Amino acid sequence: MTLSKVFQYLASLDSKDLEELYKDPWTCQAILRSLPPRSKQYILKMLLVDTYPLSLAKDWSTQASIQQHKESLKKLFDLKIIFLDKINKPIQPQQQQSSQQSSSQQQQQQQQQQQQTEQTIRLNPLFQDNIKRSLVQVNQVIFSNNSSIKDNHKPPSIDDLDSYSKSQWEKVLYFLSDDTVQPSKLISELLLSSNLTKQEGDGLSITSEGFKFLLKDVYTQIWTLLIVYLDDLEKKKGKGSGSRNDLLSFLFRLSFLNLGRGYLVSELSEQQKEYLFALKQFGLIYMRTDSSILFYPTRLIISLTTGKTLSLIQSISSERTQTQKEQGYIVLETNYRLYAYTSSSLQISLLSLFVKMLYRLPNLAVGIITRESIRTALIHGITADQIIDFVRHNSHPNAANSGQPIPDVVAEQILLWEAERNRITYTKSVLYNSFPTNDCYIATLKFAKEQDYYIWSHDPLKTLVVKEEGNDPIRNFIKKNFA
């Protein structure tokens, strides 16, 4: 899994914001460890030099991997970690020009000949200095842990933290798959802002983007909502307030904390405490109560800059070694009957978006795909291709090994049910049916076709339907030529 989501976001920030971020050594370390191996190598190669000729940088890669070389450099350029400079390199002057040329011309040509432009690359000084310091300084402390502080409560175990983060993030996913569940105000706003849900009456319903979101790994899911939160924060606090950069740096710092250890809330600024309570709702931070003196990072926040997280449709801890559960749980038969070998309420809730559920046993849920269940999914913006991909992606190993995780007859029927809804296209239009003469009708019809305003016409009744944007031009055409 790549970290393209966060890299795309960082690359979209302006130079000033990135410079502010690179002032924090923990941010620099987090970004360095998030980069692909090749990009990391390039940074380490340049760590102890001021500049390096771009032409020689080609030697860092073989001809066979030149494309990966270019992509790695581009990523570093986009993140403003590496800069490209042009310097004038002196060369040997060429042979003396003809004596017939004026001395000023000869002098000008000599100056041009004695200089040659060379491209060099260099590391961002802030980024470079912070990485250097991090390599020589050991035992750096981000926040004090709870070694000398007791809050009179048994600290959560790692299993407790895993269970908590899984439960919290599943709640977020439940808000998408079950419109009867009411999310918190923050989560509701983020789901709307990110176009994962849409307002329908008094509640929220999932969109096509929301269904695609459910198919992604948890790392991408979390960053998707965090990025929306960052942007919303910048809008509320005002551009240039620095709140977005503060939260980004805070997130990167939290990713270096130790799993299972508690840290003092009192060491945080008021702004960071506000962020902390927001991160609780994502399952990234555990606090026993809002007034607890300690907070505990969960596996999700620690893995935030490495991407080493499993899909939360699987369990974070106990289920990750059970390959059958990781590979899939759905068996779909040619009679449209679907068997889901799962005890997860979340998985069943996801299936109910496009399956009519019939009954549920302790480790098995049975449903059937019907025209109405598919139409309900289509109304919510879920496409037939997304449904087919979802079944394939989560098919049971036995079904996947058969080479046909979803029967062709079922896949084709789902596409046909979608095509039923696409037989009619809706276009805002204007109808003309009172032409003074036949010549006026014919001329206007020709004009509408030439200008791409034409939709439909009926010659016997001299009726013409055109696009809405063509209304004023056609009225002007008739007035000018037939008034």
Swiss-Prot record:
InterPro entries linked: Tfb2_C, TFIIH_p52/Tfb2
Subunit structure, interactors included: Component of the 7-subunit TFIIH core complex composed of XPB/repB, XPD/repD, gtf2h1, gtf2h2, gtf2h3, gtf2h4 and gtf2h5, which is active in NER. The core complex associates with the 3-subunit CDK-activating kinase (CAK) module composed of cycH/cyclin H, cdk7 and mnat1 to form the 10-subunit holoenzyme (holo-TFIIH) active in transcription.
This protein's record includes keyword Repeat: no
Keywords assigned by UniProt, alphabetized: DNA damage, DNA repair, Nucleus, Transcription, Transcription regulation
Region annotated Disordered, chain positions: 93-117
GO cellular component: transcription factor TFIIH core complex; transcription factor TFIIH holo complex
Protein task: Component of the general transcription and DNA repair factor IIH (TFIIH) core complex, which is involved in general and transcription-coupled nucleotide excision repair (NER) of damaged DNA and, when complexed to CAK, in RNA transcription by RNA polymerase II. In NER, TFIIH acts by opening DNA around the lesion to allow the excision of the damaged oligonucleotide and its replacement by a new DNA fragment. In transcription, TFIIH has an essential role in transcription initiation.
Family: Belongs to the TFB2 family.
Principal subcellular localization: nucleus
Native organism: Dictyostelium discoideum (Social amoeba)
Protein's name according to its UniProt entry: General transcription factor IIH subunit 4
